[in-house]
């Protein structure tokens, strides 16, 4: 896992260069939004169960997927879906705090699409629920922090597409 600071320093180090003005500006932006990211993470942590509940209600609860024969019909499958949504929310929050999506590749997306396909998990419904989670989260943390979180929710969706 990297953060925005490590990523730019590693890049400059590999190139054997000092930090130039564009890198310094990128770091300034990261530090200027630090308090916003920390407040958003605290709000998400305090409301995680509600975010997931609302996202499921908004995207999956009354669809064919939860009816008999649907992929979330049994309690076990439903619980697995909720567990996965919790992972996505938690790791998107970590990425937002770090300002870097690498943890999503390492801990969430690496092999996930293939695993879902082999288990018959509907990727479209998963993406729909992540998008709903993005909307619910944004309404809680505000538009600026919601936009930042949206980057990482979209990254997960893109990795699953």
From Swiss-Prot:
The modification N4-methylasparagine is found at residue 71. GO terms for biological process: photosynthesis. InterPro entries: Allophycocyanin_b, Globin-like_sf, Phycobilisome_asu/bsu, Phycobilisome_asu/bsu_sf. Belongs to the phycobiliprotein family. Heterodimer of an alpha and a beta chain. It is a peripheral membrane protein. CDD domains: APC_beta. SUPFAM superfamilies: Globin-like (SSF46458). It comes from Galdieria sulphuraria (Red alga). (2R,3E)-phycocyanobilin binds at residue 81. Light-harvesting photosynthetic bile pigment-protein from the phycobiliprotein complex. Allophycocyanin has a maximum absorption at approximately 650 nanometers. Contains one covalently linked phycocyanobilin chromophore. Pfam families: Phycobilisome (PF00502). It is found in: Plastid, Chloroplast thylakoid membrane. The gene is apcB. Keywords: Antenna complex, Bile pigment, Chloroplast, Chromophore, Electron transport, Membrane, Methylation, Photosynthesis, Phycobilisome, Plastid, Thylakoid, Transport. GO terms for cellular component: chloroplast thylakoid membrane; phycobilisome. This is Allophycocyanin beta chain. Although originally identified as Cyanidium caldarium, these sequences derive from Galdieria sulphuraria.
């Amino acid at each position: 896992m990297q953060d925005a600071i490590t990523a730019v320093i590693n890049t400059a180090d590999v190139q054997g260069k000092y930090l130039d003005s564009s890198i310094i500006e990128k770091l300034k932006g990261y530090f200027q939004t630090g308090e916003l990211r920390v407040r958003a993470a605290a709000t998400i942590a305090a409301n995680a169960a509600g975010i997931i509940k609302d996202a499921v209600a908004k995207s999956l609860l009354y669809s064919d997927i939860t009816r008999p024969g649907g992929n979330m019909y049994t309690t076990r499958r439903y619980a697995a879906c909720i567990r996965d949504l919790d992972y996505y929310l938690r790791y998107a929050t970590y990425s937002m705090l770090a300002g870097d999506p690498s943890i999503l590749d390492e801990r969430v997306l690496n092999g996930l699409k293939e695993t879902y396909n082999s288990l018959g998990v509907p990727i479209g419904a998963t993406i729909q629920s992540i998008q709903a989670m993005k909307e619910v989260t944004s309404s809680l943390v505000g538009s600026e922090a919601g936009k930042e979180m949206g980057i990482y929710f979209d990254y997960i969706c893109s990795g699953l597409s």
